């Protein structure tokens, strides 16, 4: 019997797959547990519609990420911090501070985990910070740290 998997089933199939399984297994386990539905024309067309919708959403997310990249690369985030001799900071600038400043000054919400700051910023001046907006889109954000008066 052909079934469409609604959830991942270890050793049998992944969500969205159409596979042939034993009739008893399909009726008594997969369909009863809500793990699969029978692969009839109605369910197959519903699956096709769902796959098309997911593709559209993926394309839309990619476009939004590209637009956000252009916006971020045009901006400079201004932060102030106390510093000592030679422009070294007391403490450091973290990705959370950068994300908060973006939200506050420019109303752009970026998750702090997407800001790929290898080491916290510990010196005054300009720093280019990579921001991973999408698996295929990475922006570079300029961060300017000035001395606090």
Swiss-Prot record:
Gene Ontology terms, MF aspect: rRNA binding; structural constituent of ribosome
GO annotation, biological process: translation
One Pfam match: Ribosomal_L9_C
GO cellular component: ribonucleoprotein complex; ribosome
PROSITE patterns (alphabetical): RIBOSOMAL_L9 (PS00651)
Gene3D superfamilies tied to this protein: Ribosomal protein L9, C-terminal domain (3.10.430.100), Ribosomal protein L9, N-terminal domain (3.40.5.10)
Superkingdom in the source lineage: Bacteria
UniProt function note: Binds to the 23S rRNA.
Similarity remark: Belongs to the bacterial ribosomal protein bL9 family.
Name of the featured protein: Large ribosomal subunit protein bL9
Gene label: rplI
